[in-house]
Amino acid sequence: MTTKDLVAALTAGRIVYDNGAEQVFDHSGATTYVDRGHAVHGEWYVDDDGRFALFWPPSYRAPYDLQWIVEDGSIVGLRFSHREHGSQFSARYA
């Protein structure tokens, strides 16, 4: 996914994860993750290698590879793969 595609994918709207949590990525680089009414605020960015990463204060950084989730020719969500741990999770556009 190109940097332009990353930005477009993340800022396209609210996403809902498989566990019901929601997240919004703002063009400014701010992000809000809400799980069972509890909101956590962080930052997202594209690093020097053109890869997506999250920063959650005070010091946690998480690098991810992103892939589109496509159904019947339409983009319906994103698959996140942690670049260091290999864990994966999916989210759909709300």
Which residues fall in each region the model found?
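Lipid interaction determinants
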Residues: M1-A94
